[in-house]
């Protein structure tokens, strides 16, 4: 199937997963326990979905080790991202971590000798501007600190390295072991989050003690159904992204996925959740669309 079609399907799956997650966070309790429970349910569903499609996939020692490393880095990224959001301003945290897409984007040229044209460089610059303009600054109680910056940088590096590992695996003779790679990574993620939930349930630490302004409990039928659907979306998104990272140029794939995903998220927030964008955010979205066009190097 055409890579453009696969990319569109991947981004659609990612968007649907994001919409479902937004629905959950708006109506049901949040907090670290709810997040870890969500991650455990989604990761387990994704692993089972991939297993159901592929059966018992073959896995070389290289794939097993890289998948475990991928799962560990993803876990560290999740923890440091949450800590950064807790310790400092949301706006700056969002921009800094979003810019991590530059790491896998430039890795194609630095590690795999991929060529980046002047038009694509312009697209990357516009993508950076899109990330910055799409976030509203000011009016936040939390201030920047050394602790916040340390967590931000850790999340930035981990997020970027996740993309590099995808590209790395798909650039080896073991690229056909996609299902094994993802199943192992999702299993690692499930075990980590499930272990946290178990410890939290036993010790009563990390559990939400209030109703969060009347929000419903996450342990209910509707949230579980949403998590199951989200897990299927995550499985499809990650499987397609892993494949595309090996067959598309890094300077095209990673900025398009991240920048295009941001534009789609902004559009969904307007159409579905009736959110209003500032003039600056509209400019950011327009730059994001132009940057994706330039990254595809149509000239």
Feature-to-residue mapping (PLM):
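Polytopic alpha-helical membrane proteins, predominantly small-molecule transporters/carriers
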Residues: 1-299
